[in-house]
Regions:
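FIC/Doc superfamily catalytic core
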Residues: 1-265
Length: 265
């Protein structure tokens, strides 16, 4: 049995979809409507987060960063192999950016997380969302959705409910997120701007915590060590999850190692 109540999560997303025109009118920057495909991909992303937490996979550990890249692939392309083949160019370009972007790739996210393990789970989840969205962004596309799933992953590992977009929180979520994408995480100004944004978004996440999104109120809590040493490169050869045990929404071989796919450096 999983940790997340996916039907309740879907119900919240469907309400946002139905009322999106009203929500959009309240935003300073108009957003594209939520299509059925966007919702299906988000639900597959939540299912993937569920499995990662159940299997105690630390996506910040060397050799496991590829699971964050997989989350982005899911929100953009879903899990259908044919659909993914259509996006092969974007997937490859995103992979290169993810590993190589100066000051904005996975290295930045992992280092930020390692420096803030002593903070509350709300601050860590918020900070990682901010790192993903602020310039330079972690991914080419889908940073908002993938960032929300990353925050949900961190929260769920601590036994907290995931963040889920709802009619009641949509405006409060979209407006600062739009500002974030134009805010640089580099340079001296970031030292003044980002901490305040982190604190406000952490309070927002805490205010949105809804136990209905969990199948049980005592969801698994994974201990977070006070420090996390980086393993050597041999960890990259560690076997990934066995695809045959993955839950139905992510049945394609998303967890198995592929020798043709770039591994964590």
């Amino acid at each position: 049995m999983g940790l997340l109540n996916l039907p309740v999560i879907e119900s919240s997303l469907r309400r946002v979809q139905r009322e999106f025109e009203i929500i959009n009118q309240q935003l300073g920057w108009q957003r594209d409507p939520m299509s059925d495909e966007v919702i299906a991909n988000l639900l597959a992303g939540y299912a993937y987060v569920d499995v990662l937490v159940q299997r105690d996979i630390d996506v910040f550990a060397m050799g496991k960063h590829k699971h964050l890249l997989q989350l982005n692939n899911i929100v953009l392309c879903g899990v259908d192999p044919t659909r993914r083949a259509e996006f092969s160019g974007l997937i490859k370009a995103t992979e290169n950016r993810f590993y190589d972007e100066p000051g904005g790739g996975i290295e930045d996210v992992v280092e930020w997380h390692a420096r803030h393990l002593d903070q509350s789970v709300w601050r860590r989840a918020a900070g990682l969302y901010v790192r993903a969205l602020s310039k330079p962004q972690l991914f080419i596309e889908g940073n908002h959705r993938t960032g929300a799933l990353l925050a949900s992953y961190v929260l769920l590992r601590d036994g907290k409910p995931p963040f889920v977009l709802a009619v009641e929180n949509a405006v409060a979520y979209f407006e600062p997120s739009t500002v974030l994408r134009d805010t640089s995480k580099l340079g001296p100004m970031s030292l003044f701007r980002l901490p305040g944004i982190n604190r406000r978004f952490a309070r927002f996440l805490q205010d949105q915590a809804d136990p209905r999104y969990l199948l049980a109120p005592d969801a698994l809590t994974i201990p977070v060590p006070s420090h996390r040493p980086f393993p050597d490169h041999r960890d990259c050869a560690s076997p990934a999850l066995n695809d045959h045990d993955v839950v139905a929404p992510i049945a394609p071989p998303l967890f198995e190692e592929n020798p043709h796919v770039r591994q964590d450096p």
